[in-house]
Amino acid sequence: MDSASADASVTGSGNAKGSSAERVNGGGKFYKLEILVSDPQKRAGEAGLGPYVSYQISTRTDNPSYHGNQKASFDDIIVVHRRYNDVVLLHDILQNDHPTCIIPPLPDKKVLQYIAGDRFGRRFTQRRCHSLQNFLRRVSQHPILSTSKVLEIFLVGNEWDTYRKNIAGTLQNAQKEDVTDAVMNAFKKVHNQNEEFTEIRDRSDKLDNSVNRINKVFHRVVKKNEAIIEDYSKLGLTLQELQELVSSDNDKLADSLKVFIEGVTQFSYGLQDLNMFIDYEYLIDLKDLSHYIGSMKQTMRLKDQKQIDYEELSDYLTKSIKEKNNLISGYGGGNFLTSKLEELAGYNQEASRRDKINKLESTISSLTTELETAKKVADTFEQETLKEVKKFEEIKNDELKISLNNLADENIKFYERMLETWEKVDQSLR
């Protein structure tokens, strides 16, 4: 376990704005947990492996378990370095261990960047760094996920490599079973859907559509700002050439041009900083929120799968009971032609009927037990999903507030800087 000073943990990264300190339940007590992802670095791979990007993950917590059960201060910082695949494994383990929880999504693998060779570029790594920050912040805010032992192992670091090697194979088998279940029920629908879930789906669809529209608008804003920045850069170069031409003939005009060029340059730099914030952070927040909504829908689909399992068992049980009753009353067990053929072949129809009734009674008994279990599972998933949706709403509202505040702060900072710059230019030109 690496340690760092308290001051070092909060410097040098814009991602610090996305970090959070939440109280998490551990053994009946509540502990603070703050996670910061920063400093993406290209590193050389081991023998035979290519280079990769690692991310510094700094954790502050007063949970003694994170500090070897010694008395810990919240200012004591644990620092580890993890690559993207490590975070993917953490995500998959949480998903496997907590099937009823809404597991925050991860950034996409970005295959195109791998093919183009841009996965070590600043824009790609910084955007991914911010997205990983969003993921770990959501985990730290979740009352169940934040107390997971695997999260502690991931953040502390001493046992992570061993744990990763031991768990990978087992996890893949469990995920294959989940995929099979999902495919089997992909085109089935719940017959008796709770109206509350219908309302939740409608709200989430509307929110997702709104987020995607805002995302498209700000993508256009980024493109437009890039064009403006380029135009002002060209304007600055042209004015510099003009300044050189008049510097020998008119010192006053040359000085005025110099001041104006500085204003143009400051505007270009300021807009570039604002644009980088929108591109590297705000757009990532919007995209991650859309993916988070998708994770919530996935949890609701899993809840639906359990409900579908219960409804299908119920239908099967009803059919079995009906068939048994028909046999008892003498109307079941096959059609008229089949009965005549059995009679001609010398079958004892009464013995066959009793045998079918006995088998159906055994089936009904087994189905009744399975139906009770399926009902409990479906009800549990429904209750837990409602709790998860409530927590999702809390985290989502908190994120929107933080993200919009950051966007407002960056815009205010830009315009205050421009006001100060051009007031100086105006005074100098008078």
Curated annotation (Swiss-Prot):
Q: Where is the PX domain?
A: 33-162
Q: What is its main location?
A: cytoplasm
This protein's GO cellular component annotations are: cytoplasmic side of endosome membrane; cytosol; early endosome; perinuclear region of cytoplasm; phagophore assembly site membrane
Which ranges of the sequence are coiled-coil?
A: 351-414
Key words of the record = Autophagy, Coiled coil, Cytoplasm, Endosome, Lipid-binding, Membrane, Protein transport, Transport
Binding residues for a 1,2-diacyl-sn-glycero-3-phospho-(1D-myo-inositol-3-phosphate): 83, 109, 128
Q: Which residues cross the membrane?
A: none
The ranges of region (Disordered) come to 1-22
Q: Cellular location of this protein?
A: Cytoplasm, Cytosol; Preautophagosomal structure membrane; Endosome membrane
| CDD domains registered for this protein in UniProt | PX_Atg24p
Membrane topology (UniProt) = Peripheral membrane protein
Record-stated family? Belongs to the sorting nexin family.
Q: State its role.
A: Sorting nexin, involved in the separation or division of vacuoles throughout the entire life cycle of the cells. Involved in retrieval of late-Golgi SNAREs from post-Golgi endosomes to the trans-Golgi network, for cytoplasm to vacuole transport (Cvt), and autophagy of large cargos including mitophagy, pexophagy and glycophagy.
> What is recorded about the domains?
The PX domain binds phosphatidylinositol 3-phosphate which is necessary for peripheral membrane localization to the perivacuolar punctate structures.
Protein name (record): Sorting nexin-4
Q: Which organism is it from?
A: Candida glabrata (strain ATCC 2001 / BCRC 20586 / JCM 3761 / NBRC 0622 / NRRL Y-65 / CBS 138)
- What gene name is given for the protein in this entry? SNX4
